[in-house]
Amino acid sequence: MAAADPAPTHARERRDVVVPVSGPEDPPERAWLVLPHRHPVSTLLDETRDAVVGLAETLAAVLPVTVLAHPRDAGAARLVPPEVDLLRAPVGSPLLGRTGPSFIRRPEGLAAVAWRSAAGLTGTGPLDGAAATAVAEAAGLPLLTPLLCAPRGAWVTDGEGTAVVAADPVLDGRINGAWTPGQVAAEFAALLGITRVLWVPPAPRPDTGPWGGPGHLASWVRLQGDGEAAVHWRGDRFHPEHPYAAAALRFLQGADDAAGRPLRVRTVTGAAQPAEYDPAERGPRSLLDTLPLGAAVLRPAFEDAAGEEAAAAACTALHPGLPQLSFPAPPLLRLAGALNDLVLLQPRP
């Protein structure tokens, strides 16, 4: 697209009132997941499907859950428990939290945003775009389709007008052509109500899960509101997660949020890998990979006592007062992805 037109989008229909997009602490109305019917490693498909169903059951203890399954998935009805809604849709990977729709509040109510696909460059597949349509139709929400590709996994927000955005992929010329940082920031302001965009500069970031592509930025950076932020950390300079963690930390320290407050940034060291672990596990063992659910918070669980203690303490600091649910992180990283990669939370109207 031409660089002179910074952000053509259907959202231009209503720009008089733009409410900042929901932050991580906003209570959700429903959780959405995808039950995959294919897998990059075919021998792991059944185990992955079982893990997704287990995650749905865990979430269903505190809020309504819908699982999307492909129309040709004959076994889905037997797997999905009765307390979880099953919806047929032409979906692909289970990375709905990374590639699914974003939700915005407009004067007339909640709407969904289907970002332009970056299939093949961010771990997405050709069918992932259909998930946004399926979710919007099932939820009865209008669907906006901007020309910008800013997948939900590439940015996080505090719900107060500030967003941290990964320069890679959003400023990747293969994905967004000649879009400049200023043009992207203008689109974020018009569509999402975000008035302060902070860019994490490009740095090596390990893939998360067997579908490939960088995992959700929420595993690396958490904006907590009131000028507070947390960064997933690895102090060992030889650790493959150190370069991206260091890039995020350097950039955010001293940066201001949308209210003009200097961000107070702290580091949260990820859980350690035990001496014996499955080398197929891909992605950060991040303690920031949590999902506030309103009445509770879902956090990653780990196989060793030290990891569990650290995860519980980090979750308490991030979400004080919320009861904690947990789900094993190492199997998910081996089979599918992080919690924020897999779970899409729809905010209340």
PLM-predicted stretches and their roles:
Residues A2-P349:
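The feature marks the mature, well-folded catalytic cores of soluble enzymes
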